[in-house]
Amino acid sequence: MTNIRKSHPLMKILNNAFIDLPAPSNISSWWNLGSLLGICLILQILTGLFLAMHYTSDTTTAFSSVAHICRDVNYGWIIRYMHANGASMFFICLYMHVGRGMYYGSYTFLETWNIGVILLFAVMATAFMGYVLPWGQMSFWGATVITNLLSAIPYIGTSLVEWIWGGFSVDKATLTRFFAFHFILPFIIAALAMVHLLFLHETGSNNPTGISSDTDKIPFHPYYTIKDILGALLLILALMLLVLFTPDLLGDPDNYTPANPLNTPPHIKPEWYFLFAYAILRSIPNKLGGVLALVLSILILILMPLLHTSKQRSMMFRPFSQCLFWILVANLLTLTWIGGQPVEHPYIIIGQLASVTYFLLILVLMPTASMIENSLLKW
């Protein structure tokens, strides 16, 4: 008699994806991030669901309802802070996951990579709309500034912004629709993640060497299930340390002031995970140019497979490319820092230099280094 997990139509799918899946024997902890992202998504959906039970998406009561969740709902404070800080953990895992893909050449799995970029955009959109919901000062002004960027689109810009707002300013209609979108998008993300996994399992996982591992595969369970459980425990430990000791560390104090359209905060800035893109946006004096640079800073990931000029897939044996990769990481950290600073000297010029360096590294320096490494192989 065959095992039920191998014969049952539904169990068979799960078995082939998580139990009997042939996995490379040498994948490192950088390959844990996919499962961690899955855990983050489930956690966000669950905490978000419980928050939605008590939240009201009306401009007059939204701020009060969040305060009510924290003060009066049983364990509401922990659910709220797990949701807010869970988003930060989500983005830490997400950026590390993308970085891993760039370092080890995982972008050569075209379908998997492109779905991943779409997922990144979807998660960013969800996080942005979620930040608007508490209806604090930074929620309101963040929504106003970011949605207003669409007015830079020629001809249709102004109409588009007013259509998104549902009026002539960010108001009740905007908040209600943002709540609706914020609720539905995580389920779309979950569906896309399944497609992402489907395409990955068509080719099998990459590994640190970038060399085919077809001759040396091991079953996913128990080897990588136990490894993923360790990763999950560390993720939950980090999240709970953040939630229980410094829940407001990554938030903005301005968001504890109810939204007031008549009073602009001195420094409008998004959550920390968008600061690098915000710095690129601000570094260009032209509105349309800034918006294009903002979109391209993420969309540039689509070009990664085209910019791959090396004969080797992974950067494991490419020291020049490794140096440039870590310079890129340092550059992104610099941009993140600049995004949180006021628009004044010397931050303006640092931001502009870091923005130019960002595009220069990805579009010119890294492909050139790969070509130099190719020629060195002939020696």
Curated annotation (Swiss-Prot):
Protein's cellular compartments: Mitochondrion inner membrane
An example Gene Ontology CC term for this record: mitochondrial inner membrane
Binding site for a ubiquinone: H201
Positions that bind heme b b566: H97, H196
UniProt cofactor(s): heme b
Textual note on the cofactor: Binds 2 heme b groups non-covalently.
Keyword Disulfide bond applies: no
Record-annotated membrane-spanning stretches: 33-53, 77-98, 113-133, 178-198, 226-246, 288-308, 320-340, 347-367
Disulfide pattern: none
Family affiliation: Belongs to the cytochrome b family.
Subunit composition and interactions: The cytochrome bc1 complex contains 11 subunits: 3 respiratory subunits (MT-CYB, CYC1 and UQCRFS1), 2 core proteins (UQCRC1 and UQCRC2) and 6 low-molecular weight proteins (UQCRH/QCR6, UQCRB/QCR7, UQCRQ/QCR8, UQCR10/QCR9, UQCR11/QCR10 and a cleavage product of UQCRFS1). This cytochrome bc1 complex then forms a dimer.
Other remarks on this protein: Heme 1 (or BL or b562) is low-potential and absorbs at about 562 nm, and heme 2 (or BH or b566) is high-potential and absorbs at about 566 nm.
Protein name in UniProt: Cytochrome b
Gene from which the chain derives: MT-CYB
